[in-house]
């Protein structure tokens, strides 16, 4: 009886740490660590889709994590349900259920890095999106309206310039149903590529579980774009192209929720440089207290421009050849995103 009560209390506590969106949620490795059963309520009451992502080499642990439904799928199975031609991820479908239970059958309920992404059938754009794993994503196709890339490990996304294809795109570290500017969860836009008849390309580094991209599918239905990923981030960014820097596990929605992974760095140390002087625009989504400021250093003057102060949008303009971004708030409830763009002067 006492053991059952303790498990129930622990499940309630752990559920509060999930990353919540209006019609979806994310579960990380620490939500399941030391937990035999994790109960999730309401998200599947009208049916739901479940995607999983795990790093290669962690299949043995993932096989011991089960989603309670009629077929009793394990996470390793779910994470490797791919379309054989595109390597797009296929979900497990759960019919209407007030509560779903996730079982951790690993010895001592240990865990390895993972993502369990549960999306209600109420979510928008379920029929116009594609989902991929970062560790095997390399697509040269007409893009879907929304593309979501998943990984519990940091990754880099690249799309080269293309003079023959045009498009526009916005990016957020959310699922596909929150990537548009009209999203219901108040999620911060990390980057956009303006509407153009030629594709300028981009390279972005991601230390979040999801990166979603929304394209102008109506205007450019035949745009043929190459998008690929490599695992890892290096913190050496190009100031002459727009981009962003975030804290590990950043989501950027009004809930303030943060995703956790043992593969994330404990700090942020990024350098953004160019060959010549530029007028630099920095826009921050800052959820960090005064004890954990986001330090922005002008590499030309060595001046420091800290950003902090709880939940606030902040901005800074500099004339410089480079910017360093440093932050040491990992492991706290703090988070941040810093979006940058510039023009030559």
Residue map of PLM features:
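Cleavable N-terminal signal peptides of Sec/SRP-targeted secreted and luminal proteins
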Residues: 2-17
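Domain-level representation of secreted and single-pass membrane ectodomains enriched
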Residues: 15-345
């Amino acid at each position: 009886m006492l053991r059952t009560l303790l498990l129930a209390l622990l499940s309630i506590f752990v559920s509060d740490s999930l990353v919540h969106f209006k019609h979806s949620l994310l579960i990380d490795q620490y939500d399941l660590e030391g937990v035999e059963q994790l109960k999730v309520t309401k998200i599947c009451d009208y049916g739901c889709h479940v995607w999983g992502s795990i790093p290669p080499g962690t299949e043995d642990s993932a096989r011991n994590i089960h989603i309670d439904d009629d077929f009793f799928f394990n996470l390793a199975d779910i994470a490797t349900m791919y379309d054989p031609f595109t390597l797009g991820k296929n979900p497990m479908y759960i019919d209407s259920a007030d509560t779903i239970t996730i079982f951790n059958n690993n010895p001592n309920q240990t865990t390895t890095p993972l993502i369990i992404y549960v999306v209600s059938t109420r979510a928008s754009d379920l029929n116009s999106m594609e989902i991929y794993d970062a560790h095997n994503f390399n697509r040269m196709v007409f893009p879907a309206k929304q593309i979501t890339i998943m990984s519990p490990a940091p990754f880099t996304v690249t799309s080269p310039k293309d003079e023959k294809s045009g498009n526009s795109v916005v990016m957020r570290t959310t699922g596909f149903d929150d990537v548009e500017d009209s999203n219901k969860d108040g999620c911060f836009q990390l980057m956009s590529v303006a509407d153009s008849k030629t594709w300028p390309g981009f390279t972005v580094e991601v230390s979040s579980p999801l990166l979603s991209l929304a394209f102008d599918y109506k205007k450019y239905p035949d745009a043929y774009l190459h998008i690929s990923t490599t695992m890892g981030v290096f913190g050496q960014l190009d100031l002459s192209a727009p981009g962003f820097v975030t804290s590990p596990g950043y989501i950027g929605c009004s809930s303030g929720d943060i995703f956790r992974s043992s593969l994330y760095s404990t700090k942020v140390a990024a350098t953004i440089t160019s060959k010549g002087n530029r007028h630099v625009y920095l826009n921050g989504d800052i959820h960090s207290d005064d004890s954990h400021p986001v330090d922005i250093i002008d590499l030309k003057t060595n001046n420091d421009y800290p950003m902090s102060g709880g939940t606030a949008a902040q901005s800074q303009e500099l004339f410089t050849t480079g910017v360093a971004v440093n932050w040491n708030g990992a492991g706290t409830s703090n988070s941040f995103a810093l979006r940058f763009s510039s023009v030559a002067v």
